[in-house]
Amino acid sequence: ANWATTRSDASRSIDSGPPMAPELDRQPLLDDPSFRGVAFCRELSARVDAWLRRLWEAADAPTSGAALVAVGGYGRGELSPGSDLDVWLIHAPRTDVSALADRVWYPIWDSDVKLGHAVRTVKESLALASDDLDTATAVLSVRHLAGDESLSAELAEKGLALWRKRSRRWLEEMDRGIRDRHEKAGEVAFLLEPDLKNGRGGLRDVHAIDWAALAGMPLLAGDDVAVAEAYELLLSARVELHRRTGRAA
């Protein structure tokens, strides 16, 4: 089941977990100009990884039957200063993890990090991924953080197999989505503030290239270096926009 994304949606009567939960200090990284682009995103993702593992341990999580995984931009190691933190708590069937979820989510909410989260079994995740493109691509980015690694591996492996099995459907839907996205974002050459994420040639297009390759239909022919350089430039611009404005941009 999906969980609410703000504390106001959750019951105030629930125990928020250990009184001295580990804290995430991002400011030193934000103040260090030597970190930019891909290097910044990888370093921030690594620091958040370590923080979430400490939270998992502080929550007295079991060693089997439950796992915490990163998905989306966080799963890809693309965290910018204003990025949402997308994490799923994956659990075995007939395992009640509601109390564990509260002990993990509340310290994250308390840190003022924007949290996108869900609690599901592997089967539930795959059922959603079989019928929803956003969930299907999220599963492609699953990265294990803490807990039962076999659950994370099962989700990643079966998610990729499902993606390839339904590749024709997903690629056709992706094509329609890309065209709509480009139209909504406008012509880049005429925009004072082009959309670095959703515009033509933006980060979403880089992701689409990767997803097509995972489906067995690569879109590139020996031009990986140029794409990598463009990806670095896009992430560098996005990181600096987040740094200077203090918000997602």
Please place each PLM-identified region on the residue numbering.
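Low-acidity, Ser/Thr- and Arg-rich intrinsically disordered low-complexity segments
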Residues: 2-13
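N-terminal regions immediately upstream of nucleotidyltransferase
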Residues: 14-64, 187
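Conserved nucleotidyltransferase catalytic core and NTase-mimicking acidic/glycine-rich helix/loop elements
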Residues: 23-27, 162-249
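Conserved catalytic core of two-metal-ion nucleotidyltransferases
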Residues: 46-49, 53, 59, 97-150
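Active-site nucleotide-donor binding segment shared across nucleotidyl transfer reactions
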Residues: 49-98
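Short, polar/flexible loop-turn hinges at active-site or ligand-entry regions and domain interfaces
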Residues: 91-97, 145-147, 165, 218-223
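Helix-loop-helix transmembrane hairpins and adjacent membrane-interface loops
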Residues: 93, 101-102, 121, 149-157, ...
